[in-house]
Amino acid sequence: MALKWTTVLLIQLSFYFSSGSCGKVLVWAAEYSLWMNMKTILKELVQRGHEVTVLASSASILFDPNDSSTLKLEVYPTSLTKTEFENIIMQLVKRLSEIQKDTFWLPFSQEQEILWAINDIIRNFCKDVVSNKKLMKKLQESRFDIVFADAYLPCGELLAELFNIPFVYSHSFSPGYSFERHSGGFIFPPSYVPVVMSKLSDQMTFMERVKNMLYVLYFDFWFQIFNMKKWDQFYSEVLGRPTTLSETMRKADIWLMRNSWNFKFPHPFLPNVDFVGGLHCKPAKPLPKEMEEFVQSSGENGVVVFSLGSMVSNMTEERANVIATALAKIPQKVLWRFDGNKPDALGLNTRLYKWIPQNDLLGHPKTRAFITHGGANGIYEAIYHGIPMVGIPLFFDQPDNIAHMKAKGAAVRVDFNTMSSTDLLNALKTVINDPSYKENIMKLSRIQHDQPVKPLDRAVFWIEFVMRHKGAKHLRVAAHNLTWFQYHSLDVIGFLLACVATVLFIITKCCLFCFWKFARKGKKGKRD
């Protein structure tokens, strides 16, 4: 009997302590690959007993209001329908994929217009939330402990400011590292850290460093200034005081960067930054029966996995046939994620799928190569499982991601718009038959696995840490409180130069005075 009551008491105590450590997390939702990373973290938070509420628009592409998942959805109405929103995104993606990238400035200016269009949509979503008094009252009364958001899609920091609670960012990159540098205080010396979207490596020639500096200036004085004006005005109106987006973002307690040093080029970082790249990666699960049979039928030659991501749903008939012709000439079997009309040149060794279990395929022992658009999620999965890549980058950070892998000897790049079947065929033969590519990717894989704490556990730790301590201001550097000229010590340099100039002026005056005195005395002596 005593044992029975002891057991009951222990169970009650466990519930007491568990509930005491649980927190309430408000999430400003993202879409596509951004959401896939966030969802991995959120599900782990739920597993640990936290209450997670995801703020999603009625036009959201990835959320189903009727989904009975462990994540609580708070759907807010917006003027766009789901179909309209998806069509807009697909049109923007189509425009991005058609941008000619062989000129110096044109790709940036065209991508900038598209990014501004996306920003306008996100800002309207944000307005729909903060102007919804009933929803805001409900959220206020819920007494959340923290806001979790992606820095690429502003609004989460505004909600945190309105509710007076700390917030944590999940982030990959912003064009030109604008948010990271101006809002996060990140340090990216242009002498050896290439600007994102520049396609440069950290081993730059003099002219490449000149090019990199021009990119920095472009993003600082054009993209940053003109893109932020609307956000600054909107935040000032909502908060009832003059402010800026950057000023609000600077209050972030922790930045969880979805990068790692085996992928990105090294650079300095701050105390409130942790790198959790590859947090979504996991061991491969068994494949569906039909797919496993097809993979096993490849024999010793193995298989090639081909995917251009979730945002590219179709391609021209001409490009599809160029690719199909190349794939038909390799001895490997090919699993191609493709949502379009079957190419006429499709070989017997290639099967088309509207969806593939990419992580599980990359982790299969028969996989020999991965043809990818260069999305960060896919690259991390390839690194995790040690699969060399052929990169066909399309837009945004994808050319940079492939440039990183190429610099590390783990990938070959081909251009989607100009490649021939021979180009793709030769690239595949290189990464499959040249053992150096497998060796290099396996080295990166070993580094990815050799971490004292898994990236996902670190990400969850920092969110829980901020909830426990009501923030992490002790990790926030004082640089956030300085103006740009104070940060670069221009006021100090100016003061010291003024001091030197004053001393030189006094010395010069003294010398002139002495010279005048001696000259006068000499003239007087001559007259005597």
From Swiss-Prot:
It comes from the Eukaryota. It is found in: Microsome membrane; Endoplasmic reticulum membrane. It is an enzyme of class 2 (transferase). Its EC number is 2.4.1.17. It is a single-pass membrane protein. PROSITE patterns: UDPGT (PS00375). The keyword Transferase applies. The keyword tRNA processing does not apply. Keywords: Endoplasmic reticulum, Glycoprotein, Glycosyltransferase, Membrane, Microsome, Signal, Transferase, Transmembrane, Transmembrane helix. Coiled coil: none annotated. The chain crosses the membrane at residues 492-512. One of its GO terms (cellular component) is endoplasmic reticulum membrane. Residues 1-23 form the signal peptide. Its main location: membrane. InterPro entries: UDP-glycosyltransferase, UDP_glucos_trans, UDP_glycos_trans_CS. It catalyses: glucuronate acceptor + UDP-alpha-D-glucuronate = acceptor beta-D-glucuronoside + UDP + H(+). The modification N6-succinyllysine is found at K134. Glycans are attached at N66, N314, N481. GO terms for molecular function: UDP-glycosyltransferase activity. One of its GO terms (biological process) is estrogen metabolic process. UDPGT is of major importance in the conjugation and subsequent elimination of potentially toxic xenobiotics and endogenous compounds. Belongs to the UDP-glycosyltransferase family. PANTHER family: EG:EG0003.4 PROTEIN-RELATED (PTHR48043), UDP-GLUCURONOSYLTRANSFERASE 2B10-RELATED (PTHR48043:SF86). This is UDP-glucuronosyltransferase 2B10. It comes from Homo sapiens (Human).
